[in-house]
């Protein structure tokens, strides 16, 4: 595990402990379960939205709402989650990914709420999930999907977090970086397998990470290529290899109009 990931996970454990003191688990769980029957907050079907785009012959784009990153700093000083979400929805995104990590990515729970309220797209809570509390918390905020990072979790906890998410009606995007992590990810139920092209130790990106894992991917999984998609050529390279699902953040966040950049990149 990289030093930065270890540092982030230590902070996450502290955040969960502090959150439990502010609002206990039974309260968060009750709110999460109540949202299953709320017409505006019930889960929107993240995996289904991805499948529908691909079935129609289109790229399924998870468009990211991200103010900053540890490696690049602030990406978008004029950061308005609702406006960004509407722009993505108008230009063909399948789903949204909203950063909720505060310390490292300058995210916030309110950004997820604002983005989801501004459109009808399903929303991923993009964060480092290490505890069941965060899964219930995500659903209580309205999240339709959570991210599980294989490098950050042991197998038992990862399967427990997935089971909780599925029970609440959410989907799960499991993220891998190499073949060993992929073997572990394929033991989960989720069809959504994200391949992060960024090396967690060097922060360098190469699309060969995704391409190299394709031969090990079962046909019933949707491969989501993450990080390093910056040009139309990158998109064409992936689609030529039958990779039709993408998670893109930086390229959109640096553009004047994120949605228009989505349309240009995936034209």
Swiss-Prot record:
Keyword Lyase: yes
Keywords: Amino-acid biosynthesis, Aromatic amino acid biosynthesis, Decarboxylase, Lyase, Tryptophan biosynthesis
UniProt-listed InterPro entries: Aldolase_TIM, Indole-3-glycerol_P_synth, Indole-3-glycerol_P_synth_dom, Indole-3-GlycerolPSynthase_CS, RibuloseP-bd_barrel
Known EC number: 4.1.1.48
Gene Ontology biological process: L-tryptophan biosynthetic process
One example GO MF annotation: phosphoribosylanthranilate isomerase activity
Domain of life the protein comes from: Bacteria
Family classification: Belongs to the TrpC family.
Name of the protein described by the UniProt record: Indole-3-glycerol phosphate synthase
Native organism taxonomy: Bacteria, Pseudomonadati, Pseudomonadota, Betaproteobacteria, Burkholderiales
Gene (name only): trpC
